[in-house]
From Swiss-Prot:
This is D-alanine--D-alanine ligase. The gene is ddl. It comes from Bartonella bacilliformis (strain ATCC 35685 / KC583 / Herrer 020/F12,63). Cell wall formation. One of its GO terms (molecular function) is metal ion binding. Transmembrane segments: none annotated. Pfam families: Dala_Dala_lig_C, Dala_Dala_lig_N.
Amino acid sequence: MTGKHVTVLMGGWSSERSVSLSSGTACADILEAQGYNVVRVDVDDRIVSVLEELRPTTVFNALHGPFGEDGCIQGILEYLKIPYTHSGVMASALAMDKGRAKIIAASAGVSVAPSCVMSRFSLGAEHPMKPPYVIKPIREGSSFGVVIVGSDETMPLHDIMNNEWVYDDEIMVEKYVPGRELTCAVLGDEVLDVCEIVPKECFQFYDYDSKYKSGGSLHICPAKLSSNIYQNVQRMSLAAHQAIGCRGVSRSDFRFNEETGELIWLEINTQPGMTSTSLVPDIAKASGRTYGDIVKWIVEDASCMR
């Protein structure tokens, strides 16, 4: 037994609740197998009093989406002086905001696609930029709310202006870059291997189903790329991680257009999924680490005020 009391936070109330429960359960299981004293907490509005009562040695943050990875729970844990995993308050808030994260990444020499941030209510019949482009909620993950507008399509107001839209009113409109889906993880200050994601033909892009359904996508790790492109993905992943101020593990996503040679950084994820079909465990395997190795490393890296 390690003697370390780890509370795993999962669930919550964001649109990524089910993914968080899967990540949290998997991580809690492996930590228990490694001898940690684990308590699983499905987060609700009583979380402050729950944490005050438990007073864990460490919190493993397996929450996804708003509240869990935008600086909110991180601020609570800082106030309670409980060491926690993954990025801190500022980096979490910045990374969750796709527009601001792109500005910071670009300032560090990371290649990004042209984009603009606006209210969804300002959209009209005319395209906000020349199609093809992508519309994304500014603060969502797991591809929730993503709309791709093709070259010959009209403005999809019915998808964005209807009453079923449950995401932020602020959106990002970004040039669509065709090509291969690439991702790369950073662990501390070490950049890991590059992985290519190949969604099954039934999926238009790497959406929620292709991410989380068993067999929804193929992970090729290490990716079959030229050494120049491979190293550029690694360089930009580390540059974004450091410029935004991330700690622990992060994962950056890219698009690579082989026809034009265009390599574009899309976003950084400070709370990457840790389910059985998640990317970080697969990337870890390529670097000689087991799933248990990486979960243990994340826990031992936990801290406050960093």
